[in-house]
Amino acid sequence: DGTLADTEMDGHRPAFNLAFKELDLPFVWDEALYNRLLAIPGGLRRVKLHAETCGVHLSQNQLDQVRDRKRVHYLERVRQGHVHLRPGVKRLLQELNRAGVQQWIVTSSGSASVMALLEQIQKQIPSFDGVVTSDDVASGKPAPDGYRLALERSGANSAASLAIEDSAAGLSAARAAGLRCLLTPSPWDADALSESGGGAAAVLNHLGDPGQPATVLSGASCQEGAVTLKYLESLLSVPDR
């Protein structure tokens, strides 16, 4: 869901901070710290490892409480409209929908978080053909389980499918499932992810909109600075690497 909207800095980070405060935990995640923590896949794993670096041991019960309270605050922030679509998302999804292209969400977030986001943005974008969340698989990204399940449910051929991702973990998951991948790193860690985009068919800072053109960080040039169906189709013919 971070590929669709800036869910991390505007949604998950402040929700974690509210949960920490409620539970009297001595953590405050500012943007710089959270940016570094994003290298760790999985929200609770992030909390656990950060606590350990601070010399704080959290029991499983405490971690469960953080998860539950954070989820409440995240859902509330989404419903209040604090989380916004990234550039080009609405335009591209509408184009793909008109062309009859199957569109699936594959995310490491839980079902409740994803459905709250979709409920908030449903008037702006077309419906997706399916959703695979962390609740549906044994292992989240960078494991390929989610993408493999989406391919199975959709009946799509991996050679004719393409993933659009925002993280190194997502890129690894897509590649392990046999998919080519367009990487659009989060604006908060674009420098780090552009360094790790070696397995991506292309790396752009976002999908691009009129007046807000995308910048190609690696890969094929993008006409008029906007990712289109034609551009995505061209990435399917990029030699695998």
Regions found by a protein language model. Give the residues of each.
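Active-site neighborhood of HAD-like aspartate-dependent phosphohydrolases
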Residues: 1-32
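Short, acidic loop-to-helix structural element flanking the phosphoryl-transfer center
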Residues: 75-105
